[in-house]
Amino acid sequence: MAEGLVLKGTMRAHTDVVTAIATPIDNSDMIVTASRDRSIILWHLTKEDKTYGVPRRRLTGHSHFVQDVVLSSDGQFALSGSWDGELRLWDLAAGTSARRFVGHTKDVLSVAFSIDNRQIVSASRDRTIKLWNTLGECKYTIQDGDAHSDWVSCVRFSPSTLQPTIVSASWDRTVKVWNLTNCKLRNTLAGHNGYVNTVAVSPDGSLCASGGKDGVILLWDLAEGKRLYSLDAGSIIHALCFSPSRYWLCAATEQSIKIWDLESKSIVEDLKVDLKTEADATSGGGNANKKKVIYCTSLNWSADGSTLFSGYTDGVARVWAIGRY
């Protein structure tokens, strides 16, 4: 009996690319997704055979693609970043936008909450990283000097409380590590041969993984600022995430979702979507467009590491679960 991931169901409500997925830390039956359809959807997870979740609320207000969404640790608020240049804080119970964060001069590509939810960080095509409080006040802007020289595509807080850290990825081909206390540069991690789309920090804060255009994932020791090793994903990488329960790294590439066991550095899963099988399952056959090419653009694990949520270019969220087969 092998352990692997099987497609559990789909979640359909977005009409364009699913750009981000946020999962609650208490493993409750909800997730939040963001999309190029300019909306954020709060889902209730029914975990039924075909339809894994149903839309509970659609949050609207952004005037352009919503590129990223994250949840506060109590699950009460969602934070989004959009190509309209703004961040928004959403009250999920009310379904309303509680705050707008205005200051970036170009598209916001990435947002994150600090561990205590008191600080917010954002990354933009204006090449800056901004640090905000929850009132929507910009407290610091990382720009010029040591800052990135091209679009900042992704920004994440390290979960390590000993050394509060921000990690950013950029189209300038670098990953940068910043001290949160003074917003000063600690390390520039160079090694990619193309733009970097995404960066992920391991659950214990010791490692970070980066990926993008060159199709190679680089693993870094965050404390030392040193490159540890690389994993060849074979095509453009759009998202990365570490499993919260296994020593696994998951990558959304333009070919498939690949999962590595970091101990053996071998691929344990290579998840592809069969659109014909899916069409037969959801509509009982019919005119599925088999020529359509879709790929995964966003990924996140459930807090217990049992379920992998993946968002695709066709607007569908697909749910994979660990099972035996």
Curated annotation (Swiss-Prot):
Where do the WD repeat units fall?
A: 13-44, 61-91, 103-133, 147-179, 191-221, 232-261, 291-321
Q: What is this protein called?
A: Small ribosomal subunit protein RACK1
Q: Which organism is it from?
A: Glycine max
An example Gene Ontology cellular component term from the record?
nucleus
GO terms for MF: protein kinase C binding; ribosome binding; translation regulator activity
InterPro entries (alphabetical): G-protein_beta_WD-40_rep, RACK1-like, WD40/YVTN_repeat-like_dom_sf, WD40_repeat_CS, WD40_repeat_dom_sf, WD40_rpt
Ranked from the top, the taxonomy reads:
Eukaryota, Viridiplantae, Streptophyta, Embryophyta, Tracheophyta
A biological process (GO) of this protein is: negative regulation of translational frameshifting
Cysteine pairings via disulfide bonds = none
Query: Which protein family is it in?
Result: Belongs to the WD repeat G protein beta family. Ribosomal protein RACK1 subfamily.
Entry keyword set: Repeat, Ribonucleoprotein, Ribosomal protein, WD repeat
